[in-house]
A protein has these predicted regions:
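Non-heme Fe(II)/2-oxoglutarate
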Residues: 1-79, 96
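Residues at beta-strand starts and edge strands
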Residues: 10-12, 82, 105-107
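A residue-level signal for beta-strand positions that form part of recognition/binding surfaces
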Residues: 13, 85, 121
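A short glycine-rich, His/Asp/Glu-containing loop-to-beta-strand
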Residues: 81-90
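Catalytic core of non-heme Fe(II) oxygenases with the double-stranded beta-helix
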Residues: 91-161
Length: 170
């Protein structure tokens, strides 16, 4: 007997390891920005509109191109989208960023500039899709159909785009 599984109403997450090489002047500009402590050692750029700076125009264009692929080719949306807020998050090895989502936004994206090591992940979590909050099950293994948490491994040059309502952390 054959069966089919349909990932109905799934949440598509776009990720790509790019060949994008950050110029030294871009890295220097990022390092020259002012940062504020956001807790857990996570530092956020005080400027939440970094793509307005010409020094980062090449990075902005790269991000816009990936957003266009995600919205036009993956989601097949006719409308055009643009990046509003943009900021830098800095963390040292072992530091984390608490679970959060981005209200008043449609899509969120992360472009990784400098990842050290091979164990960096972008974590996601969601409410259970079946029997939400009523029953908890044990699983013989976890997969994309039964998990409430999932992650994507990332490295320098990786781009990840996802719906802004999706809770995420590092």
């Amino acid at each position: 007997m054959t069966y089919n599984i349909t990932p109905l109403f799934s949440t598509p997450i776009y990720s790509q390891d790019t060949n994008f090489k950050f110029f030294e002047k871009e890295k220097e500009f990022v390092n020259s920005l002012r940062y504020v402590d956001h807790g857990s050692g996570c530092m956020l750029s005080k400027d939440e509109y970094i793509f307005k700076h010409k020094n980062l125009n090449r990075i902005k264009i790269e991000c816009e191109n990936h957003l266009k692929v995600y919205t036009k080719k993956v989601l097949c949306i006719n409308e055009n989208f643009y990046i509003t807020n943009s900021w830098i998050t800095k963390k040292e090895r072992g530091q984390s960023h608490t679970w959060h989502m981005h209200p008043n936004s449609v899509f969120s994206g992360v472009f990784y500039m400098n990842v050290e090591g091979s164990d960096c992940r972008l974590n996601f979590r969601a409410k259970p899709q079946f029997s939400p909050g009523v029953l908890e099950y044990s699983h013989s293994e976890y997969n994309q159909f039964n998990s409430t948490k999932w992650w994507i491994s990332v490295k320098s040059g990786a781009v990840v785009i996802f719906p802004s309502h999706l809770e995420h952390g590092v």
